[in-house]
């Protein structure tokens, strides 16, 4: 199963799932998600790809994959698409900054444990 894959391959599967569920999947019953501007879509995609880059760097520095998937900013990323139109830019930036700090803390902890 999935557990037999390398951490990098498991991350690829997780990013693919995020792209499918957090980026491509829409909820037509929610006004904020039934239509998104190009800028909003671009920023959300950039946020997911930034998470992937941070995770790949962290994996190279011996951070465990479950810890990367469990950061609070990861869950907030999944809910970011539901931010109101006038708030999404600030919301996305906040999630971006939280991802940076939370993953940096995991990298620092992995360095101390090594």
Question: Language-model segments: which ranges?
Answer:
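Conserved catalytic/coupling modules of large nucleotide/cofactor-utilizing molecular machines
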Residues: 2-114
């Amino acid at each position: 199963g999935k557990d037999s894959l390398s951490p990098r391959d498991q991350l690829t599967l997780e990013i693919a799932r995020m792209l499918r569920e957090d980026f491509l999947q829409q909820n037509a019953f929610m006004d904020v998600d039934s239509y998104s501007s190009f800028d909003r879509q671009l920023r959300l995609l950039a946020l997911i790809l930034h998470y992937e880059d941070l995770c790949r760097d962290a994996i190279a520095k011996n951070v465990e994959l479950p810890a990367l998937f469990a950061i609070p900013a990861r869950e907030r990323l999944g809910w970011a698409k539901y931010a109101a139109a006038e708030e999404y830019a600030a919301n996305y930036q906040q999630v971006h900054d939280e991802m940076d700090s939370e993953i940096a803390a995991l990298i620092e902890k992995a360095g101390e444990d090594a």
